[in-house]
Amino acid sequence: MKQPIMADGPRCKRRKQANPRRKNVVNYDNVVDAGSETDEEDKLHIAEDDSLANPLDQDTSPASMPNHESSPHMSQGLLPREEEEEELRESVVEHSWHSGEILQASVAGPEEMKEDYDAMGPEATIQTTINNGTVKNANCTSDFEEYFAKRKLEERDGHAVSIEEYLQRSDTAIIYPEAPEELSRLGTPEANGQEENDLPPGTPDAFAQLLTCPYCDRGYKRLTSLKEHIKYRHEKNEENFSCPLCSYTFAYRTQLERHMVTHKPGTDQHQMLTQGAGNRKFKCTECGKAFKYKHHLKEHLRIHSGEKPYECPNCKKRFSHSGSYSSHISSKKCIGLISVNGRMRNNIKTGSSPNSVSSSPTNSAITQLRNKLENGKPLSMSEQTGLLKIKTEPLDFNDYKVLMATHGFSGSSPFMNGGLGATSPLGVHPSAQSPMQHLGVGMEAPLLGFPTMNSNLSEVQKVLQIVDNTVSRQKMDCKTEDISKLKGYHMKDPCSQPEEQGVTSPNIPPVGLPVVSHNGATKSIIDYTLEKVNEAKACLQSLTTDSRRQISNIKKEKLRTLIDLVTDDKMIENHSISTPFSCQFCKESFPGPIPLHQHERYLCKMNEEIKAVLQPHENIVPNKAGVFVDNKALLLSSVLSEKGLTSPINPYKDHMSVLKAYYAMNMEPNSDELLKISIAVGLPQEFVKEWFEQRKVYQYSNSRSPSLERTSKPLAPNSNPTTKDSLLPRSPVKPMDSITSPSIAELHNSVTSCDPPLRLTKSSHFTNIKAVDKLDHSRSNTPSPLNLSSTSSKNSHSSSYTPNSFSSEELQAEPLDLSLPKQMREPKGIIATKNKTKATSINLDHNSVSSSSENSDEPLNLTFIKKEFSNSNNLDNKSNNPVFGMNPFSAKPLYTPLPPQSAFPPATFMPPVQTSIPGLRPYPGLDQMSFLPHMAYTYPTGAATFADMQQRRKYQRKQGFQGDLLDGAQDYMSGLDDMTDSDSCLSRKKIKKTESGMYACDLCDKTFQKSSSLLRHKYEHTGKRPHQCQICKKAFKHKHHLIEHSRLHSGEKPYQCDKCGKRFSHSGSYSQHMNHRYSYCKREAEEREAAEREAREKGHLEPTELLMNRAYLQSITPQGYSDSEERESMPRDGESEKEHEKEGEEGYGKLRRRDGDEEEEEEEEESENKSMDTDPETIRDEEETGDHSMDDSSEDGKMETKSDHEEDNMEDGME
């Protein structure tokens, strides 16, 4: 079969193997095949016959090298190689011999090869030129004839047979001597050139088919390959660089330098090759890392010095690397209001001042209203109405801590801003302000399919807003301590008990603050409020009375639920007795080692180490039903449950709210964060750590408790519904016959009489039936309203809401109290059946409840209620209401309020089954994502299914990632793309923190502050490029690489020099320009314009060439820029000036590229971001568009050729 002639391979490719090892033999006759490492590369340096009887039937692997003495010209000897990728044209040296003679010498080859060479004709010659241009003939026929004639003679004599017999002897050791010169040439990259050895290995009689170079004795199968080899390697002219040892010529000095490395001893050679042939000349004095460019070292030094010269104009975050800054700007990470590191995205550092306010575009309306309040101007009704349409945002926790520290408030409050929540002139705690600050009052309800508010409800809300505005003005005008004057003003209630009167001083005069009413008259707040309250009372009289009958059913269901809970808990106790895990102090049994350890270490009252903590609770507290709760349960409930916050015997009530706030920010703090939290709350670090652990266990047990399934039993249908038929059609939501919310029953009971309220004390989970009865009874006889601001629960299956289930008689007496959140403060049974009050479509203002049946456009919302005044029959109660009957600093959970109905997710976001939080399915407002406040109103349109949001929700509580949730579906999912790697089985769940809270790579010794950084770092090991351009199909490791690459297709150039006006599409190019060319870029721009004018006048020169010639004549090249490099930068034959300009800009094309080992812990993210700027592919793409002009005076003065770039690409895994 005819041997296929292989085409020449591409020239500008890097050889894969740098150090192929070969064996040398003394004589061609004694060559024995050995395995060659370069067989796969198709690199045949010599090919020789096995000298076997039937050579055509034997597979040979010509891997051995002859001694140089075996051939006059080292025919088929060691072939010196170099690793240069570019072989540019040079002048020609003529060297000819007749192909006919060559073919005659090759008579031992197969007939197919003869046909190939006959086709060339006998006149085929090789022309080469010497420096003077003369032509000479070098007849190499004698060399070929001598060798091939000798070979044929040996084959006729049967030497091959004797060699075969000799090799088959078992007592003979075959030694393959190596020539001394071989050591100096091992590892020469040119040994891997497929394009110059087109004969595949193992070809029979392959040696006879080779054409040998007369200069270096390299063998080639085709004459064209030999011509190219001589042309590119052995021509000499004045512009080439010649190797003094082997006479190889190179077009670039850098190629010659790397080639000279191959002549060094093996140890030195390996060291220099690994160091990039000495190109990394800039070494860090701190850590010893070396860099090729001086500006790379400069930016690296900022890691050690902490300098961060780049600052984001939006969030004021600073960066040490321009690449990090560019990535931050490009990814729009600071668009939202909450940033990664606790910074408000409004140009104000959070926590810098208690007066810090939000000034982002989304809060522009709030800012305008705040300015009016600061100037003492009353708000018009239109502005007050506009406040209702301001979307609320989460308040940064740093602001929250500063506010508490400044004003001395220890309790927690709903952690939101919006309305006037975060825009108070004095930064007063948000709970003292707008009652609607907890929810998105102004959400575009029609967009989500809900009707708008009716005018009646709007009027009531306006009253509340006016009160808030005036309170804010009063706080602005008065000193901080003067706010206490507002605490004593309450309407007297004759039903209150005498001890309640001692809470506030009755001698404090009323504070009458002026406010503008509808008719423009100035009234006091009290008069105006009471007037509107009376109007709202009239609205309540239209409510139905069917809810009375539902109360009894709800009470019965609650009793059954509590019985089930107590029974299940007793069963759990009995089960734990039989387990072998018992406490060494109190001998109490536990189902496993983990609960046992937690009990022994932190909860056991017999443990001496925690007796001091439990000292206030040494006495066992009996409840009404005789169920005793020991100290352990008290501590557990005080630590885990919110119901302990208001207990008079809870010593930690001043700390729990702060702990909950920290817990909502980060559920798994490391040791450093725990220390900070313990200092902030004033508790021991071990206590804080255990609190976090118990909190997680508590929530997990609530979500997994099997006993909660029993709460899903439907309640009995209402036996005597007496709903007014005239009101039912106007209800926005049809009442449900079989299921009603227990919260509704509590609402009815809370306003029917004026008994003192029963404050929930710390109690165990075993709360008996009698206590519940007493609780319901006291609620049914109390004028002090219940709190409905946080009736959410994670433990209910059956709760539903009935908008028409409130009777006017029961609801018209007293307003609801929002100061006592119920979430996790009540016994399990109550919590399990009390979770849907938010959707009951009722809005109360002070003493008023406006029925949704009166407002058919949109269901009302109980979460808009804030009790600020009582009616004239109300005395001061024990709720510690400091401001108009409300305690603004009472303890509340971090995210108490549920979202308004207008903020519910679209239908596609409703989960089919709630698995992790049972019982939340019937009520959309209790969806899991609602517990994260900004997720309550940011349902991006880009994500079409609940599965998309479910995927995002995995990371919603991770510290530093909440800000990305505000950026919408596309940006947030792109952030998750960088954080997850399903193909390589890398997920956040599998990444474990070290003891110091860092994330360590399991393949190297690097650690990172964020798991996402570690996942991106893993790309360096796996080589995966997950981000692919859809236009040119190039792939990148990081998304911001793809973002900047896409600008090459779109033509976008967002970066512009303010001096010369030049624009850049890549941040790395822009940074390099500003760092090294800014000082003279204006002059360069003027020179470029002059060169263009001159080119237009001459008509035959390119402006770039003129500019370059002028630059060299002016000697503006920096030191170290050698003549050879000048020649490199000059245009060469066959290249257009445009290509020359692009190639000259290669020195800047590799901007900001850093090796993978350059990333530091402190600036790991910035180093990754910077890698975009240094990605050679991306920068080279930009250069192909002609973005850059040639800069010949770079500060570091190191221009690299295309071969340098490709080699570096291989080093950094970028190719």
From Swiss-Prot:
Keywords: Acetylation, Chromosome, DNA-binding, Homeobox, Isopeptide bond, Metal-binding, Nucleus, Phosphoprotein, Repeat, Repressor, Transcription, Transcription regulation, Ubl conjugation, Zinc, Zinc-finger. Gene3D superfamilies: Classic Zinc Finger, Homeodomain-like. The modification Phosphoserine is found at residues 142, 356, 360, 364, 647, 731, 780, 784, 1122, 1124, 1203. Residues 644-703 bind DNA. It is found in: Nucleus; Chromosome. It comes from the Eukaryota. Signal peptide: none annotated. The modification N6-acetyllysine is found at residue 377. Residues 12-24 have a biased composition (Basic residues). Residues 1-111, 702-740, 772-811, 1117-1215 are annotated as: Disordered. GO terms for cellular component: chromatin; nucleolus; nucleoplasm; nucleus; plasma membrane. GO terms for molecular function: DNA-binding transcription activator activity, RNA polymerase II-specific; DNA-binding transcription repressor activity, RNA polymerase II-specific; R-SMAD binding; RNA polymerase II cis-regulatory region sequence-specific DNA binding; zinc ion binding. There is a cross-link at residues 391, 479, 555, 611, 632, 713, 866 (Glycyl lysine isopeptide (Lys-Gly) (interchain with G-Cter in SUMO2)). The modification Phosphothreonine is found at residue 782. Residues 57-74 have a biased composition (Polar residues). Sumoylation on Lys-391 and Lys-866 is promoted by the E3 SUMO-protein ligase CBX4, and impairs interaction with CTBP1 and transcription repression activity. Disulfide bonds: none annotated. Residues 89-98, 1127-1149, 1168-1179, 1186-1205 have a biased composition (Basic and acidic residues). This is Zinc finger E-box-binding homeobox 2. The gene is Zeb2.
